[in-house]
Design a protein with these regions (language model features):
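Short aromatic-rich membrane-water interface segments that cap or initiate transmembrane helices
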Residues: 65-83, 198-212, 276-280, 408-413, ...
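Predominantly late transmembrane helices and immediately cytosolic-facing juxtamembrane segments
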Residues: 227, 344-348, 408-409, 413-417, ...
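Short helix-boundary/re-entrant hairpin motifs in multi-pass inner-membrane proteins
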Residues: 162, 216-281, 308-309, 394
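Transmembrane helix-loop-helix hairpins at membrane boundaries of multipass inner-membrane proteins
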Residues: 1-7, 18-116, 194-198, 556-561
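C-terminal ends of transmembrane helices
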Residues: 17-27, 94-106, 149-158, 162, ...
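Cytoplasmic/organellar membrane-interface segments at the starts of transmembrane helices
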Residues: 240, 373, 432, 439-446, ...
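Helix-coil boundary and interhelical linker segments in multi-pass alpha-helical membrane proteins
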Residues: 76, 126-132, 188, 262-278, ...
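Alpha-helical multi-pass transmembrane bundles of energy-transducing inner-membrane proteins
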Residues: 26, 113-120, 124-208, 222, ...
Length: 565
């Protein structure tokens, strides 16, 4: 059974998703628990393959139907893809359980449809990170996209329009990637990624390869909401179903970023002119994302919309880390993918909890959040501090590695941008003028908000501190000091804004809110929602405390060959 763990990561949630509606017909809750159980099994398999790759020091190759590549499709799991699989399945499991209270009043068809789409979204995301075949990646990309469109459309109000807009733009992105695959296949005659890496060498300076890279870059840029290709994201995050929004916002844009990493650093290599040019463009767009995303967040009054634009800025951090082009910049980018997934998921979990309890997320009617939802407020605070980059949160270390890489590469401009991007969070990440007193009603949510805010600022020992640390370290070693300045300024902006969040939650008077789902006690939410929020908050701290171990024992063991020479 253990040897089949790679395929079970995808097969378990796929089977459960296909059977979900049938089981829900007999018992409306049975199908949902089937999907939740399958995701738990997928998480167990992901942990197993991660342990196996780390102990053996070798990548796992699983041939589908025992067809040897390059003719057959294979799953390839190295430390990086295994970490991504664990990240996806863990957050997926948390959010799947978290969604249960939202479904209590729904009929079997609605519940079954929701969890069918949710299971398929997990399948698509997991498949994208473990497949070793270019066309197979496209198939999983479409599975991810179609299920994501459906979950967004289930959010009500303007969600159908948001999903339709995302579908139109997302289809362009997927089509561009498919065109890229066609060009690469025409040049090399293979779809296997490892085989492609060997056969593409004579074409690395050719115009068809440049066109293929451009299509791949734009296609995945759309999917990861890279500035200025992010137009679909604000409405998609804002109107997505509150149960699934944390999974969509936390993970869905990170997997396309991983795909760019896989192609540029592991298959093509970064030492040829075309990829170097692409990384330079990526860095420029990353700078634009940090600045424009921050500015746009300042102008928002809707909680989710602010977080959507902040995600544009955070994707900019990842882009800058990759553009720095050295080991520490790379580590900072990957670490920020992991940390931001937890931080953003934590924030959206709390938002969903507020919406579940009060029926609204109007920032001017949530006074006293720290008194009503204390744990949620603390978690948001930790996430915010981590995103700002306050040590020892995880966000600090990812930004630190970005800055160090920029410094070592002599790219000081990136440092300036990273600093500016962090400062924006003080003014535009989450405007909580009406969150006073919520800690009394939703203690767990308040704690979670506090943790998330601290992590987003970058307060140690949360996760956000460490990701920013590695980003700065990469910029420093690369001599790219501008990146370091950008990281520092962005962190200051984060700090200014998120400390204001704490002021609103813990100091301001309570606002008059009508509770549509009343829950007494410190948790302030049903256990199915409180436990995932608590796990997200703890995850931010764990990623911070063990950031060095994650980098040394996991990420460095899966570095691209270019950094090992």
């Amino acid at each position: 059974m253990i040897q089949h763990c790679p395929v079970l990561i995808v097969l378990l949630p796929l089977t459960a998703a296909l059977l979900c509606l049938l089981f829900s017909k007999f018992n409306k809750n049975l199908g949902s628990w089937l999907v939740i159980g399958s995701i738990a099994g997928s998480l167990a398999c992901s942990l197993q393959v991660l342990h196996q790759t780390l102990t053996s020091g070798e990548a796992i190759h699983y041939w589908m139907g025992n067809w040897e590549p390059p003719l057959g499709i294979e799953f390839v799991i190295d430390p990086l893809s295994a970490v991504m699989a664990v990240l996806i399945t863990f957050i997926s499991l948390m959010v799947a359980v978290y969604s249960k209270p939202f479904m209590r009043k729904e009929d079997w068809l609605h519940i079954g449809g929701y969890y069918t789409l949710y299971g398929l979204l997990t399948v698509g995301l997991c498949g994208m990170v473990i497949t070793g075949d270019m066309f197979n990646l496209y198939v999983y990309l479409e599975v991810m996209s179609l299920s994501g469109y459906g979950l967004i459309a289930m959010g009500g109000k303007k969600s159908m329009l948001a999903a339709f807009r995302y579908m139109l733009i997302g289809t362009i992105g997927a089509s561009l990637y498919l065109i890229s695959v066609a060009y690469l296949y025409a040049m090399t005659g293979t779809l296997n990624m490892a085989d492609l890496g060997e056969r593409i060498m004579p074409y690395l300076s050719s115009p068809p390869f440049a066109l293929a890279v451009a299509c791949l870059f734009i296609g995945f840029g759309i999917k990861m909401a890279l500035f200025p290709l992010h137009g679909w994201q604000p409405d998609a995050y804002n109107f997505a179903h509150p149960g699934s929004a944390a999974f969509i916002a936390g993970v869905m844009s990170k997997v396309p970023a991983y795909a760019i990493i896989r192609f540029f650093f592991y298959i093509f290599g970064v030492n040829n002119p075309i990829i170097s040019t692409a990384l330079t463009v990526l860095g420029i767009l990353g700078i634009g994302g940090v600045l424009i995303g921050s500015i746009m967040a300042l102008a928002q009054y809707d909680f989710r919309r602010m977080l959507a634009y902040s995600s544009v800025a955070q994707i900019g951090y990842i882009a800058i880390g990759l553009a720095i082009g050295n080991m520490y910049g790379f580590i900072g980018a990957v670490l920020h993918i992991i940390n931001h997934a937890f931080m953003k998921s934590a924030l959206f979990l709390v938002i969903g909890g507020i919406q579940y309890r009060f029926g609204e997320i109007n920032l001017y009617r949530l006074g006293g959040l720290n008194k009503k939802m204390t744990l949620s407020t603390i978690t948001v605070t930790l996430a915010a501090l981590s995103m700002v980059g306050i040590p020892p949160t995880a966000g600090f270390f990812s930004k630190w590695y970005l800055m160090l890489g920029a410094y070592q590469g002599g790219q000081y401009f990136y440092i300036v941008i990273l600093v500016i991007g962090g400062i924006q969070y003080r003014f535009g990440e989450i405007n909580l003028y009406r969150l006073g007193g919520l800690n009394k009603k939703m203690t767990l949510s308040t704690i979670t908000v506090t943790l998330a805010a601290l992590s987003m600022v970058g307060i140690p020992p949360t996760a956000g501190f460490f990701s920013k640390w590695y980003l700065m370290l990469g910029a420093y070693q690369g001599g790219q000091y501008f990146y370091i300045v950008v990281l520092v300024i962005s962190s200051l902006l984060n700090a200014v804004y998120f400390f204001r969040i704490l002021e609103q939650m813990f100091v301001q008077h309570e606002a008059s809110l009508t509770e549509i789902n009343r829950h007494e006690g410190k948790l302030g939410l049903p256990p199915e929602m409180a436990i995932p929020i608590l796990c997200a908050g703890i995850g931010i701290l764990v990623l911070g405390f063990y950031s060095v171990d994650i980098v040394d024992d996991i990420l460095k063991s899966g570095l691209p060959e270019v950094f090992l020479r």
